[in-house]
Curated annotation (Swiss-Prot):
Gene: cotF
Alphabetic keyword roster: Sporulation
Pfam families, alphabetized: Coat_F
Subcellular location: Spore coat
Protein's name in the database: Spore coat protein F
Length: 160
């Protein structure tokens, strides 16, 4: 296999998904830990935060190897985070319903789960459209998509 100087498109997109998911998760963990009073649970949050920060630090050096990446930063409010978190929730819901349906033997329950799966798919589409229209998820512009990942990961890491 030859040595490439850039990542392949498919691995770049997988990296994007991981970094976007973990960045939103890290922001959520850092916001939520403030409310956690139980010392043992708080320690679990700290371990999780440190682990995700390390994951992001290990993945970020690969971003310059992504194909056609441009360097330009811009600041954004929390709307990208909240909408990204909602998109992740919708995506996870779709996956969870799909898995549950494959494990369901009762037709009535299956019908309810299919209905709920379709609702989750619709929610995902609505949130995606919102994010795309507002420039939070530039899915057809890989350079912008990756810049957002880097910005969000760095924001999540530096957040106190």
């Amino acid at each position: 296999m030859d040595e490439r100087r850039t990542l392949a498109w498919h691995e770049t997109l997988e990296m994007h998904e991981l970094v976007a998911f973990q960045s939103n998760g890290l922001i959520k963990l850092k916001k939520m830990i403030r409310e956690v009073k139980d010392p043992q649970l708080r320690q679990l949050y700290n371990v999780s935060i440190q682990g995700v920060e390390q994951n992001l630090r290990e993945l970020l050096p690969f971003f310059p190897q992504a194909p056609h990446r441009e360097d330009e930063e811009e600041e954004r409010a929390d709307n990208p985070f909240y909408s990204g978190d909602l998109l992740g929730f919708a995506k996870t819901s779709v996956r969870s319903y799909a898995i549950a349906i494959t494990e369901t033997a009762t037709p009535q329950l299956r019908n309810v789960l299919v209905k709920q799966l379709n609702a989750a798919i619709q929610l995902h589409a609505q949130v995606y459209r919102y994010m795309y229209q507002h420039g939070y998820y530039p899915s057809y512009n890989l350079s912008e998509l990756l810049k957002n990942d880097v910005r969000n990961a760095n924001r999540a890491i530096s957040m106190k």
